[in-house]
Every structure is written in structure tokens, then in C-alpha cells.
Amino acid sequence: MTRIRELDALRGFAVGGIMLVNTWQHAAHEPRTGIDWTIEALFQSRFYPIFSLLFGISFVLFLDRTRSRWALVRRLLWLLCFGLAQHTFYEGEVLTDYALYGLAVLLPASLLSSGLAALRPGSFLGGGLPVLVLGVAATVWATARGAGPLLIPGLFLIGMGLMRLRPPRRLLAPAFAVSALASALLTATWAGVGGGPGAGDWTVYSVAALAGAAAYTTGVLLVLRPWLSALLEPLGRMALTNYVTGTAVIVLCTTPLKTDPTRWSVLAVALTTVVAQVLFSGWWLTRYRYGPLEWIWRCLTWFRRVPNRLESGRDHNRPLPDPGLP
């Protein structure tokens, strides 16, 4: 099995951004500071959409490699168990939502896509366009109703549709330009620049955040170089481990976060944690194929103990399709 390294790097970028935003959400927000405004305007609600998009993409990859929807059901049910366990110490976890929406939305959508492909072999109908259109419609509906977790199923479907369509790389630059401009204009409108009617409007903010997520996604793919990929890939390959341990760090640091009026503790906790995770993930993956929680998840998915240790830094294990969290 060959991993798509760009997706690992993009996943790692999202993990780092989520750590920053989650840390900030557990800080006191009065009095407001420049750090609060910067995070809210540039980062808040921009990274979970990337995570959700990647989840839909990885769903297609896993299904194509296994040809087994039962394996996907097991994968999602075990993810639900991880989420319920995490919920005992971190109520804002997203794993339960991902598992439930995956079961309710992605599995039926995969049947729809396969059915259309069987009816019209070689047609665009079987290439993901109906799923993509359905995802866009669901995202528009969710945005009009307050966004939040309601965005997840639509973004899942968009990721699934894009993976089936495989749009050409030459579209990255124009997509980045359009989404970055849209995000900047909408964020300025939401912030009240120029005194427009959209100041403080949550729908305007939600659309700005989605455009920002698209800009970050396409921007990272455009600027990705070997040195940057080497930093982000390990973080992304161990996304489940890093996400869960990151939330544990936030819980442990709740008191200093809530008592710091300057908000510098937010940056200190988030940056220190992400740097530590980058270093640990890189070290771990020179010795093992999968991160600690990724390995447990894999063993549970396949009902067997999967070999994990590398020999002399090389992988001699027989690979199984990767149920890794995007």
C-alpha cells in the first residue's frame, strides 16, 4: 500500500491548527486581545473543515483498497469507541461525530456512487460528481443553519467526491486565489471593516471560514516542499494519537489558560505541544509503521495483532489497508 504523502502533510497541518484553536477555546476571552482577534479572524473554524474533507478522501482510499464495507463499519465503530473514551475528559471531541456521520452518510454515499458507476460505466455520474454536488448542497444547508457539526457530513461528501473526480493540479492556483480573496473579503465584512451590514453575522463568518479552509488547503499543496513535508507528514500519519494527546495537554493546562489575561499562554501551550508532537512523531515513525493509537485502531479493525516494529528503519511487514484518521 502506498500512502499519498501530500494528504499526510495536509493532515499534519490541520492537526497543528486544531491544536492552536482548541487551546484558545479553553482560555478566558475577556478582556479581548489582539491574539483573540487574530485567531478568530484567521484560524478559528478553518481546520476542522480540512480534517473533515480528508476524512471523506481517506474513506474512498480505504474502500478502494479493501473492497470491504464491513471493514469500514468496524473501523467507524471503533472510532466511536475512541471518541466516547475521549469524551470522558474532553467534551469538545469530534471523533464521535465523525464515526456517527461516517456510518450515516459515507456508507450510503459509497453505495450510491458504486450504483451509478455500475449503471453508467465510464460516465461522469460514476466519477463522483453526484456525491460532490450532494456534499456542496449539504454544506450550504448546514451553513444556513448555523454551521458547526452540521457541516461535517457535507464536507465528508465533498472529500469523497473530489477523490473520485481527481481534479487536475493546475486548478490549485486559481482555487487558492479565489478562496483566499473570498475569505479575506468576507472576514473583513464580518469584522465590520467599512461598516457594512454583515458585521458580526455568523453566516458571513461561517462562509469566510470555509473559504479560508479552502485557501489553506490549496495553499499548502502549492507551497509544499520536501523539507516542509518532512515536518508535517509524521504529524499527519499519527493524527489520531496527536489529536487525543493534544486535547489531554489542553485539559491539564486549563487553569493557566483561563487565568492568563494576555493570552500568550495559548501560543506557548499550542506551539510547545505541536513542536513536541512533530519531534516525537518523527522519532516514532523511524521505529514503527503506525502511531500508538493508530496501531491499536488497526488491530481492532482487523481483529488481529498487526506487526508494527520496523527492522533497521525499513518496513518488512506485510501491509494492510490503512484505517488511519484523516
Regions found by a protein language model. Give the residues of each.
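Alpha-helical transmembrane segments and their immediate juxtamembrane cytosolic regions
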Residues: 1-326
